[in-house]
Amino acid sequence: MDIKLLYRLAKYLRFYKKDLIIVMISLLSVSASLLLIGSIFRDLIDRGLAEDNILSVNKSILYICLLIVILSVASFFRSYFINNVAEKIVNQIRKEAYSNLINYEIEEYEELKIGDIISRLTNDIDQIATLIVNFLSFFIRNSVMLIGSITLMFFESFKLASIVIITIPILLVPLIKFGKHVKALSKKALESKSLLVSDIDETFNNIRVIYAFNHQINKIADFDTKLQSYLIYCKTRLKIRALFFAISIAVIFLTITLIVWIGASDIVQGDLSAGQIISFIYYAIIAGVSSGGIFELLSEMHLPTTALERIITIIDKTSIVHNNYYALNNSDAISIEFKNVDFTYNSRPNLKVINNMSLKINSNKFVGIVGRSGAGKSTLIQLLLRFYRQENGTILINNQDISFVKPTDIRKFIAYVPQEASIFSDTIKSNIIFGNNKASDYEINEIIKITGIEEFSTKLHDGINTKIGEKGVRLSGGQKQRIAIARALLRKPKILLLDEAMSALDTMSEQKLLNAIKKIMKGNIIISIAHRISSIESADYILVIDKGGVVTEGSHYDLSKNSEIYRNICREQLTI
């Protein structure tokens, strides 16, 4: 068990001192009640039953009933407050992990699987709640009862108590031996469970593709393979746990049997009374159950501590922070410039996606971007948004190097519409105002009309307040793209980035919407990656990108006459 991890967890406990004091008082009350019952049993037998003293018997029974009431009330407070503290702490940890995750650099998500993130924020954190309850409730209670029962056993019989003490090292040996193996298995089990969650997430996000290719049977087989892998780790871990539990039970009950045998001899010889041996056996049972509980908890601590370790790695991971950030100049005349920019994705280190790229875009320009697949078009936009950092060269907005500007400040100037419209499982309106939650109803209604959302939203039962399902499953591709564009326009950006943002619309609808966008964005910059050449024919100029660089630029007319690459791209689209 990693003490550093437990110390880290203990830091959260300081916020709940009052609750923990109640838990500790309740724990001590429970332990004291159970231990006191042993001495009452001795009096019940030696002073009551042995002497036929019914008054003493009644008094002992009354005391036992009183202790049971105290035990019950204390158990309620212990259970309620420790579980309440555990839930508060895990929610605090979950919030910290979520807050840190959502502020990671975009490139850091390339190393993470969505299923693994979900698993860590749900299953792993639930394991931490188990760790808190087990340690602060059961472990401490059992420890107090073990120490108390052993102490009281020495008062009853030093010889018999010494026999009980000998059994503790016997139980420690297998615990230490199996501990490291169980920890490794626990880590593998959690990783395997994350793969299961990833598979479930991937399956139901792509359910239409699975249906279209009749791949249900194959997916079930793949899922079963992952499930069996997870079960193998669980089975092995549970087998070791069961073996240790069996050894513990055998040692505990053999010890109690030995105590009864030796104790019976002492009674016959007059060294112990019947009440003392009953009281001693009671304490021995408590000691056995408590030690068994402690050892079982210790054997099971590896799973939640491994989960805690996985969560701590998320909380402690820090993104690259530049200490010399400056505010971005908020001038009316906006400009963008790339100077000899190079970029390579970490996942593809041998492929230079952007290669010595240079370009300049000034205010009041509608700029089209064309190029074959993999030429670097979308990467250009993502560098501008500071999703990634260029390796070499400089990217300027308003003549400022964006490497020295907070990414959040840069994105205040920009609205981005990807080809795959990102829609949240809420209402149409909530998806639109995601771009600007301070927009007035008038502004929202105007944007809805301009983007053509009004045409289909009025046919829905609740209009723009209609719930559209997870990822907008109840909408068509074109409808989702209109919502994504409305969200971007409501933001009132200085720079609008369209990455094949109208690919699901027909040519006529696309032109109508594009004309509306140009009116709204007058005086600012529109950069549009073309799905169809027709969508950028009216652009002020077009950048032709090939192999990560700008090879030529000009109007549609000029490029059609003078650029072989551009003509080939146009020709390829006509043949599709």
UniProtKB/Swiss-Prot annotation:
InterPro entries: AAA+_ATPase, ABC1_TM_dom, ABC1_TM_sf, ABC_transporter-like_ATP-bd, ABC_transporter-like_CS, P-loop_NTPase, Type_1_exporter. This is Putative export ATP-binding/permease protein RP696. The lineage of its organism: Bacteria, Pseudomonadati, Pseudomonadota, Alphaproteobacteria, Rickettsiales. GO terms for molecular function: ABC-type oligopeptide transporter activity; ATP binding; ATP hydrolysis activity. Belongs to the ABC transporter superfamily. It comes from the Bacteria. The chain crosses the membrane at residues 21-41, 61-81, 135-155, 158-178, 242-262, 277-297. It comes from Rickettsia prowazekii (strain Madrid E). Residues 20-303 form the ABC transmembrane type-1 domain. Residues 336-572 form the ABC transporter domain. Keywords: ATP-binding, Cell inner membrane, Cell membrane, Membrane, Nucleotide-binding, Translocase, Transmembrane, Transmembrane helix, Transport.
